[in-house]
């Protein structure tokens, strides 16, 4: 697939790009891989670090939107920012342009440090243009009704908020179309685990 990592230094190991839709089960797969000793680098955690108190990205966000973006403790008010970025695609792109470069740099550094197989768990793997960092793409998929139910249970979101978050990403069907491995998370944990084990047994793509 075009844009995938190339060159001799990538051929000796696998760089798994783990992605999917919101609340489809990416973290569950990540925990499975980590439990088997595979380093898992979480883009969401890196994004949080990118806007930590004192960071340049947080300063830019506050300058752009005002001090209402901060909690009383001086941290980013994620709920306040979410209300903006999930209602305005242009503002979402502006915020992402302040965060994604540092996330990408950290991912690249992790790949260069790790000589063996590594997993980059990146929800916006396609949207952020990071497919060139990986040698294969795994997409965790589930039916829309299960995705909605998980978002309601996990995040307490209403239907409008759920729709906005899902619409902010590529359609799951499109991600599946670009995947090397599709993990169906409509069944139970045992079913998902078997699929992950099989994917690991595959030869590097």
Curated annotation (Swiss-Prot):
Give the residue range of the signal peptide: none
Positions with a binding annotation for ATP: 23-28
Identify the metabolic or biological route this protein is part of.
Answer: Cofactor biosynthesis; coenzyme A biosynthesis; CoA from (R)-pantothenate: step 5/5
* Catalytic activity field: 3'-dephospho-CoA + ATP = ADP + CoA + H(+)
Give a single Pfam family match: CoaE
Please give the chief subcellular localization of this protein: cytoplasm
Q: Where in the cell is it found?
A: Cytoplasm
**Where does this protein have coiled-coil stretches?**
none
Name the GO cellular-component terms.
Answer: cytoplasm
Gene3D superfamilies attached here? P-loop containing nucleotide triphosphate hydrolases
Domain DPCK, residue spans? 15-205
Answer yes or no on keyword Metal-binding: no
Question: Annotated Gene Ontology MF terms?
Answer: ATP binding; dephospho-CoA kinase activity
Choose any GO biological process term that the UniProt entry carries and state it: coenzyme A biosynthetic process
Give the enzyme's EC designation: 2.7.1.24
Keyword line:
ATP-binding, Coenzyme A biosynthesis, Cytoplasm, Kinase, Nucleotide-binding, Transferase
InterPro entries per UniProt: Depp_CoAkinase (IPR001977), P-loop_NTPase (IPR027417)
Purpose: Catalyzes the phosphorylation of the 3'-hydroxyl group of dephosphocoenzyme A to form coenzyme A.
The record's family statement is:
Belongs to the CoaE family.
Q: Which PANTHER family match?
A: BIFUNCTIONAL COENZYME A SYNTHASE-RELATED, DEPHOSPHO-COA KINASE-RELATED
Protein name, UniProt field: Dephospho-CoA kinase
């Amino acid at each position: 697939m075009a844009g995938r990592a190339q060159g001799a230094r990538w051929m000796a190991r696998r760089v798994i790009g783990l992605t999917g839709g919101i609340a489809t089960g990416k973290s569950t797969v990540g925990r499975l891989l980590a439990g088997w000793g595979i380093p898992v680098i979480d883009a969401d955690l890196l994004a949080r670090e990118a806007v930590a108190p004192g960071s340049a990205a947080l300063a830019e966000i506050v300058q752009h939107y005002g001090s209402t973006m901060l909690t009383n403790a001086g941290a980013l008010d994620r709920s306040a920012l979410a209300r903006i970025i999930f209602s305005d695609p242009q503002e979402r792109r502006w915020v992402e342009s302040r965060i994604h470069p540092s996330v990408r740099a950290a991912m690249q550094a992790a790949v260069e440090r790790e000589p063996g197989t590594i997993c980059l768990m990146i929800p916006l793997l396609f949207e952020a243009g990071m497919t060139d960092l990986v040698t294969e793409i795994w997409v965790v998929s589930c039916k829309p009704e299960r995705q909605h139910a998980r978002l309601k249970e996990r995040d307490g979101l209403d239907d409008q908020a759920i729709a906005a978050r899902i619409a902010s990403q590529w359609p799951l069907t499109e991600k599946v179309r670009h995947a090397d491995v599709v993990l169906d998370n409509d069944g139970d944990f045992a079913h998902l685990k078997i699929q992950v084990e099989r994917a690991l047994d595959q030869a590097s793509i």
